[in-house]
């Protein structure tokens, strides 16, 4: 039934979407994709299993096996990120389409000032596998993986400034 009629639950914390921590926005995005994309759950579970293994290696300082997990984490992370990006792009386009429909005679003009962007969790210009290898010393010190899809976020900007710094919570 849920595959035929996809929906995203809205609850009392949803109003604070822009103000909530990144993991809240990731979870809401992931739930929506899970409903609409058959292969998403497999990629999601595979990525987070690989992340857990890599973080265990970092915590226990067993570097000899980290390269295998870097590759697995990177491969699954790219799949996961591509699904998130595609879904986000479609949702964003639909959002702006709806705003354009209601905007001509309403108070929704301020929505045109807001830019909604997806941050994938690492520099888009860099290869994730290379980045994991390059940041290995930093990750070892922190005993966890510092970049990847588990750090992705949806950002709300007004004139390239984080909307949370400009708007009040009610706005």
What positions do the PLM features span?
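Extended, charged alpha-helical "arm/stalk" segments used for dimerization and assembly
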Residues: 1-56
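Conserved NTPase motor "head" modules and their coupling/switch loops across ABC/AAA+ ATPases, GTPases
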Residues: 60, 64-171
